[in-house]
Each structure stands twice: as C-alpha cells, then as structure tokens.
Amino acid sequence: MASKKAGGSTRNGRDSEAKRLGVKAYGNELIPAGSIIVRQRGTKFHAGDNVGMGKDHTLFAKVDGYVEFKTKGALNRKTVSIRPYTGSEE
C-alpha cells in the first residue's frame, strides 16, 4: 500500500534557452569580412562604415579590418565601424 498521497502537478519548470547575445569582436580586433561583430535584440549598436545589419539586427563586417566602437550625434548613439585592413599595418 502506498504511504504517500499523490502529489499535484505543477505548471512551472520551464525556461527558454539562452540566445548567446552580445559583442563578439572587440575594439581594434582584426576580423575578416562576414564576421559577426554584435548579436543583439533591437539596435543597441548601430551600423557604421563597412558594417552591415542582418534582419535580426546582427552587425557584421563587410570588409576585412579593425573593429571601432564610437558614440555619435546628439543622441550619443553607439556605432560600430570597420577600419579597412590595408596589409601594411602591424
């Protein structure tokens, strides 16, 4: 005979998987074209020179070069640009 009453069910106990958002390449880092620089929700960072934006607001490099983070304008928008790699640097 069971010595414990049946427990009720719960509607909790689930969580969504982490989305691995954030900065993937930092300032002055040399990266190849096509590399992801920032994975984000919305436009926390805006695309600057030589940077493209995917449909999920992911920023990626359009050319080989060095990552540069800046704030611009009256709204102090954070922008990410790529300074093209010429081959003579470093």
Curated annotation (Swiss-Prot):
SUPFAM superfamilies (alphabetical): Ribosomal L27 protein-like
Gene3D superfamilies named among the record's database cross-references: 2.40.50.100
GO CC terms in record: cytosolic large ribosomal subunit
Signal peptide positions on this chain: none
GO molecular function: structural constituent of ribosome
InterPro entries linked to this entry: Ribosomal_bL27, Ribosomal_bL27_CS
Listed GO biological process terms: translation
The entry's keywords: Ribonucleoprotein, Ribosomal protein
Renumbered residue ranges of the record's region Disordered: 1-21
PANTHER family (UniProt xref): LARGE RIBOSOMAL SUBUNIT PROTEIN BL27M (PTHR15893:SF0), RIBOSOMAL PROTEIN L27 (PTHR15893)
Family as reported in the entry's similarity comment: Belongs to the bacterial ribosomal protein bL27 family.
Name the UniProt record assigns to this protein: Large ribosomal subunit protein bL27
Organism per entry: Neisseria meningitidis serogroup B (strain ATCC BAA-335 / MC58)
Gene: rpmA
